[in-house]
Amino acid sequence: MKGTPSFGKRNKNLHIRCRRCGKNSYHVRKKVCAACGFGRSRRIRRYSWQNKKITGQRLK
């Protein structure tokens, strides 16, 4: 058997499916979605660094 005794404790669902965004990111104990911010704010959590920037330059 591999791993330390602490690894045996890692068998519970920390995140469940979010009601608002549908991703598996709703933290059960915190009651906050890590993906969309549901439970923390009414606004959808969005950042500019989430998507890659398109420079418009082609490689030669």
UniProtKB/Swiss-Prot annotation:
Pfam families cross-referenced by the UniProt entry: Ribosomal_L37e
GO cellular component: cytosolic large ribosomal subunit
UniProt entry keywords in alphabetical sequence: Metal-binding, Ribonucleoprotein, Ribosomal protein, RNA-binding, rRNA-binding, Zinc, Zinc-finger
BP term (GO), one: translation
Gene3D superfamilies tied to this protein: 2.20.25.30
Names of the cofactor(s): Zn(2+)
Record-listed Zn(2+) binding positions: 18, 21, 33, 36
GO molecular function: rRNA binding; structural constituent of ribosome; zinc ion binding
Zn-finger region bounds: C4-type: 18-36
UniProt cofactor note: Binds 1 zinc ion per subunit.
UniProt function note: Binds to the 23S rRNA.
Family membership: Belongs to the eukaryotic ribosomal protein eL37 family.
UniProt name for this protein: Large ribosomal subunit protein eL37
Organism ancestry: Archaea, Methanobacteriati, Methanobacteriota, Methanomada group, Methanobacteria
